[in-house]
Amino acid sequence: MAYSYTEKKRIRKSFAELPHVMDIPYLLAIQVDSYEQFLQENKKPKARENTGLQAAFSSIFPIESNSNNAELQFVEYYLGAPEFDERECISRGSTFAAPLRVKIRLVIKDKDSKDKNSKAAIKDIREQNVYMGEIPLMTDNGTFIINGTERVIVSQLHRSPGVFFDHDKGKSHSSGKVLYNARIIPYRGSWLDFEFDAKDLVFARIDRRRKLLGTIILRALGMDTNEILDTFFEKVSVYKGEEQFEIDLVADRLRGEMAQFDIVSPDGEVLVEQGKRINARRIRQIEQSGMKKLAVPDEYLYERILAEDIVVNDEVIAKANTLIDHELLVKLSAFEASESIKEFKILFTNDIDHGTYIADTLRADSTGSREEALIEIYKVMRPGEPPTIDTAEKLFESMFFNADRYDLSNVGRMKFNRRLGRTFENTDDPDIKREQSVLTKDDIIDVLKELINIRNGIGEVDDIDHLGNRRIRSVGEMAENQFRVGLVRVERAVKERLSSAESDNLSPQDLINSKPVAAAVKEFFGSSQLSQFMDQNNPLSEITHKRRISALGPGGLTRERAGFEVRDVHNTHYGRVCPIETPEGPNIGLINSLATFAKTNEFGFLETPYRKVVDGKVTDDIEYLSAIEEVGTVIAQADSELDENGVLAEEMVMVRSGGESVRMPSDKVTHMDVSPSQVVSVAASLIPFLEHDDANRALMGSNMQRQAVPTLRADKPLVGTGMERHVARDSGVCVIARRGGVIEDVDASRIVVRVNEDEMQAGEAGIDIYNLIKYTRSNQNTCINQRIIVNQGDEIAGGDILADGPSTDLGELALGQNMRVAFMPWNGYNFEDSILLSERVVKEDRFTTIHIQELTCVARDTKLGTEEITADIPNVGEAALSALDESGIVYIGAEVDAGDILVGKVTPKGETQLTPEEKLLRAIFGEKAADVKDTSLRVPTSTKGTVIDVQVFTRDGVEKDARAKSIEKSQLDNYRKDLKEELRIFEEAARSRISHLLDGQAISGGAGLKSGTVLAESELLEMSLETLLDIQPVEEEIAERLTQIQEFLVDKQKDIDTKFAEKKRKLTAGDDLAHGVQKIVKVYLAVKRRIQPGDKMAGRHGNKGVVSRIMPVEDMPYDENGNPVDIVLNPLGVPSRMNIGQVLETHLGMAAKGLGDKINGMIKAQAAVTELREFLDKIYNKVGGEQVDLDSLSDDDIRALAQNLRDGVPMGTAVFDGAREVQIDELLELAGYPSSGQQTLYDGRTGQKFDRPVTVGYMYMLKLNHLVDDKMHARSTGSYSLVTQQPLGGKAQFGGQRFGEMEVWALEAYGATYTLQEMLTVKSDDVEGRTRMYKNIVDGEQYMDPGMPESFNVLTKEIKSLGINIELKESN
């Protein structure tokens, strides 16, 4: 295989034995593709599909006026360019969005057109581009920048529209009878439910309102009794015989019934005795006997139901749906034969599979006509309003049959038709789509029929947790729905205005107010439950957040209502949703993560890829199947054995079929898994030896990797899974080359690439410039910084990684550090999962992290005047102002401590009453009262750091201070320098290109040279660019190329001038600040945090712990070579938790490190390249797994590779396809270690040997974002709650510890009276007492006199509010 520039620098040894069938798809596709479909930004307006914005517009427009004399038509929309780029938006706190302009056509019709039938003649057409607010744009990495913060819209898993059949599991009724129900769920509109009650009557509910009899809905659809009975029942004819009634005999209908009388054949043989059940054999006998009719006793007809009216001499004797009783039969027998009752029809019903439910419901239904039924429905939907036929009809029509109010959607119609066994054609014809989106009479009848079939025991209820019944709503679709909500509001307003459009001579812009649209979109992105503050701890947490799937949110579930079934793993999750990665706690199972290979299809259902299998031969054709399409397939596992022809080797194969794992013959197999890791999500697939970890611990491991803080120096995992490269690449934190070329110039903050000739477009200079992000704050206050990994002159290809981001190392995800660990108890310091750490780890800054805090100071307008940012602050000594400049803002580079002033600010204050002491002082010293108070921005408690950046934003129209101007100047200078450099590079590139072109060419003059001169490249390179451009070559083609280059340079100069002017305009213009804000100063503090006791650390297997002590290196256990271990872990943490993966990782890590040491030894001994090759070949190709083609690497590549392997040879043990025990043993032996993985250790304090060998190796440890510095907190005098006057709680409020009820009991039990008294009074809510105590301490007196606690006053006030007067009598 060919290795990329970064891959060949450090090749990860893979143990995978299964063939590589398919690349891992782009991990952010679910976000990026969805929003791309919504905007369709890169498509021409005419070529846009009817989705997203286009669909929203075309569903609302055209809007007709109420009087039909004018209409607004939608033509097309355009998105403008955003005003600020992504980085500017983040620093300014604005939204990264593009203006949306819509071309709207106003058509005014002629009312007075003579011909009444034809469409009104068009009188006037006005077209105009209307501004419709701003639409947030997605960044390349799938995020949105809203008000300066990066946010992610999480996809939602909701119930698919369609029809669902279910039952209550016997919980609704006391008898435990199972009651079935059907529910039609549209994409938007009213829900329609049908349900059985305990008496087997069918009821309907609309929008979960009061129950109605189901037949009322049928009557409202225009069906009468006979039509309803015809639709739902088969009929049986009853004939009047000589002595008995006879019925048509259809033998099949008797199956399973109990014979109520002897069934006798025409020749007198008893075929079925009374009381016997009629089975298949007896049915055959009846059919063979040739009987056509069956004589039945009268009792057989009792309780049967008449299918049609019985009419004699135009008089209705019995109505349809009447139960037959003795009286009726006597009446029928009494008629003479002449009076035409030779036969009548009854409904075919029985107790087994033809229930009488609809007939019984009809009998209970008092409405006799459509009108009555409509009014009944109206009463339920609008209780208390007087119904009229007209309004009732309109309401019913609009609920289910009006496309504006009801929309099943494409998905809903597909699911509906599939469930009822009909065909579904996907169409693009808007009219057919509109027809399909509403319900029809047949739809409702078919749903009822299916429900009755299920009640009769034919058919199954649906499983609502099946992924075929739940679909994904991604960003694009949710944004479209919000946009449509805004447009509907606009439509209402426009309709009223349209009528007067002609008379008032209005244009489309006057008619349309875009505020509601902008507000709806803004509300969705800003405050929807699914628009979340991005988790930006590290690249993995970003990717995982974007791939998250939530069942919560608008239109979804709520935590409280969700039961176990919804949260549980379902067999359709396989390859679609990860069974491991989900939060612990109340959201477990409601928030899931997309599996590695999963994607959504056009209907929003999750699909997973499989290889097709034809007659036992596994092909390389890949087919994506949704959970619906997967029904009926037989899927073999990815590790099924194949022979050399790709045919399944074993006769019986382990397969998944119908949701079960079973063995099946190989010729039955239809598909095969693509990869063993297709089951799990990205985070879970980063856990090596996942297959050896208990699922609960794997869940913790997946979740804790997301909390790892990027360390100062990223260190790739020695034991990985091979997935690290994909995550780092797709997360977007690395700089990736757009095109191949040569690195022209490189420094800490920028890379310049001279593009390859064949990748350039015509007439461009072929230079790509990449600016790096340096020390920027992330959402979680961690540090985002990109580091270059290329050198000048390197050749790179498009897609290569040029710079590492946070937590990446040579293009691989690196969340933690490889630590030398030993599993052994050590003086109780690893009790209860504590971790003992060596001081060496701190010294080498292995777990040192940088955190960046943003502190903001806002100067506002107040009632008493404007706040001022200044260095002149009252009553503050010189020392406190030493770090401020003349504008009152801290210098960059200042090291500050808690309480230091960062930005000096004074606020005007009103007149205050002076105390007698203050008056006296004023009189003596003659000092006038200062009319401002100090409200400066200070460093928060327990924070210490370095100022790394300051930004000043000034309101438009307010003069900028010196600091703002200097920041602006330096930004402009930097930008100018960048542009000049850019131009210089372009000119240099042009020079070398021209020299290359003119090399050996004859010239016809120019630049003071004689005609016919031939110049060599070396001479040309010494000439200036002006001279070169002056030369006129003989050859036409080359002259043409020179002209192109010259034109390009002129354009580039213009382009650079406009860029500079634009940047200057943006910088010098005032900022758009909130109302009443004059100035905002943002100060960024970088805090360096070393690891210390109390910090939380974890491995990747859910093995978490807290650092208990940091020991000197010399006291740590060491091995026979004197190498001390870095970390001592408790061996008791392994067996009960069943995460054995950590032990295997430790062993393999030891081997990896040992091999690195061997390579290091060879390099130090200056071994020949051939020797290195040989050893590398042993490592990569002799022990299991994938073959690495070392021959394709040059000697220099091999040397570079060996240099990078000195710290250890990285291993990739993929999920379910990883290293086996034998292979680990072989590598340990190759590295020169015992295959047991254990070593003899010595106590660092005494030098004595420990009793038995200890497992020592390398484990990848993470430092999690639960740092003791953020949690430690102590309170001095601080703020108090307003009502109770008690101290507030929590670190953020600088609060105290609550001394609760039980603590009071403890002190009572000890009889600690005075301690108790001060706890309940002066330390809590005795306002006067605490002031007096403060005063006493100032005066040097050591006593307290407690007063009345405020909570007592609160109590008396509450009692008074109940109308009981309570007074306090003070007695001496």
Curated annotation (Swiss-Prot):
One of its GO terms (biological process) is DNA-templated transcription. Its EC number is 2.7.7.6. GO terms for molecular function: DNA binding; DNA-directed RNA polymerase activity; ribonucleoside binding. The keyword Magnesium does not apply. Coiled coil: none annotated. CDD domains: RNA_pol_B_RPB2. It is an enzyme of class 2 (transferase). One of its GO terms (cellular component) is DNA-directed RNA polymerase complex. Keywords: DNA-directed RNA polymerase, Nucleotidyltransferase, Transcription, Transferase. It catalyses: RNA(n) + a ribonucleoside 5'-triphosphate = RNA(n+1) + diphosphate. InterPro entries: DNA-dir_RNA_pol_bsu_ext_1_sf, DNA-dir_RNA_pol_bsu_external_1, DNA-dir_RNA_pol_su2, DNA-dir_RNAP_su2_dom, DNA-dir_RNAP_su2_hyb_sf, RNA_pol_bsu_bac, RNA_pol_bsu_CS, RNA_pol_bsu_protrusion. The RNAP catalytic core consists of 2 alpha, 1 beta, 1 beta' and 1 omega subunit. When a sigma factor is associated with the core the holoenzyme is formed, which can initiate transcription. DNA-dependent RNA polymerase catalyzes the transcription of DNA into RNA using the four ribonucleoside triphosphates as substrates. Belongs to the RNA polymerase beta chain family. This is DNA-directed RNA polymerase subunit beta. The gene is rpoB.
